[in-house]
A protein has these predicted regions:
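Class I S-adenosyl-L-methionine-dependent methyltransferase catalytic core
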Residues: 2-220
Length: 220
């Protein structure tokens, strides 16, 4: 069993977290999924119970992998079976491909390769990805469904980010995004389109419902 708790990739992330102040370029692949967006996607394609790429602070699901687990070394399908149902969510890192002791820990091509292998074993894998149809990693028809989101999506700063100066004081970064579904039991169309505004508005409604006292009592 390879120990992934001290890779160069994780060392660099921990270094950034430890800095008292940051530049926007420090964020790299650490932009966070907005809660409202996740809740809307979860309602459409969930329940999503396993966050595949988390830093331990930004996880959207009750079960999650962190960088020290290396999601690319894990059996996602088996984990979902152990959890007892539901699907997995991913806002994957876009770092260049890196290895640790012969095993890939980053790289979208390798993430997609592992995802397709896990799909064959069973389970649903819901990815939030940048629209990059010309990139080598773009899976195309290997994804069972691709929902293109009309309108750019604002992503949140990581929890550890502290701006070094006024020029670094932004709250979001916007990207063209698609939702990819990897699930060999999918019976819907291969392509669809979603509205950013409808998604985010529905997500905000769900967030407000979660804050209502009666909802919290039921959940308890």
């Amino acid at each position: 069993m390879i120990d992934f708790s001290n890779t160069e990739y994780l060392q660099h992330i921990n270094y950034l977290r430890s800095k008292p102040k940051h530049l926007l370029r420090d964020i790299g692949d650490q932009w966070r999924t907005p809660d409202a967006l996740f809740l809307a996607i979860n309602e459409l394609y969930g329940p999503l119970v396993l966050d595949l790429f988390s830093d331990g602070q930004n996880n959207k699901c009750p079960h999650f992998y962190t960088e020290s687990d290396n999601a690319l070394a894990q059996d996602w399908a088996q984990k979902l079976q152990e959890i007892g149902g539901g699907g997995a969510f991913a806002n994957p890192p876009y770092s260049r491909a890196k290895k640790h002791k012969g095993s890939y820990i980053t790289g979208m091509s390798y993430i997609m390769k592992h995802t397709i292998a896990q799909r064959e074993k069973g389970g649903r894998y819901v990815f939030l990805v940048k629209v990059a149809t010309s990139e080598e990693w773009w899976p195309g028809e290997k994804a069972d469904h691709i929902a293109f989101i009309r309108g750019r999506i604002p992503f949140d700063l990581p929890a550890w980010f502290s701006p070094a100066n006024k020029r670094q004081e932004v709250t979001t970064a916007s990207f063209g995004i698609a939702v990819m579904i990897f699930d060999k039991t999918w019976t819907g169309s291969p392509i669809s389109y979603l509205s950013r505004d409808v998604l985010l508005n529905r997500g905000m409604e769900l967030m407000n419902e979660l804050k209502e006292p009666q909802t919290l009592v039921i959940a308890a």
